[in-house]
Regions:
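Small-residue-rich beta-alpha loop regions that form the catalytic core of phosphotransfer
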Residues: 2-89
Length: 89
């Protein structure tokens, strides 16, 4: 059975707007046996909601964004019961 990975992406973070690095990362994780799901944030607080609502069913959450996106992702993960919390990268 594949491991599940949630990619939380803030498309507004960073200076480059290219999606090439994201596609490359998704490909690498897929080849490593992960079933990858990509979700984009649209506004403040979205990463928290995504991590909390979708993270408990995942083995790993990868945060692709800036400090704020990472902070929100961690906040969402910490709302998941300890025994169901995924790793965060």
């Amino acid at each position: 059975m594949d491991k599940k990975l949630l990619f939380i992406v803030n498309p507004r973070a960073g200076k480059t707007k290219s999606s090439a690095p994201l596609f490359e990362a998704v490909s690498i994780y897929s080849e490593a046996g992960y079933l990858v799901s990509v979700r984009q944030t649209r506004g403040r607080g979205d990463a928290t909601v995504l991590a909390e609502t979708l993270g408990a069913d995942c083995d790993l959450i990868v945060c692709h964004g800036g400090d704020g996106t990472l902070n929100e992702t961690i906040n969402g993960v910490m709302r998941i019961p300890k025994e169901k919390r995924p790793m965060v990268s």
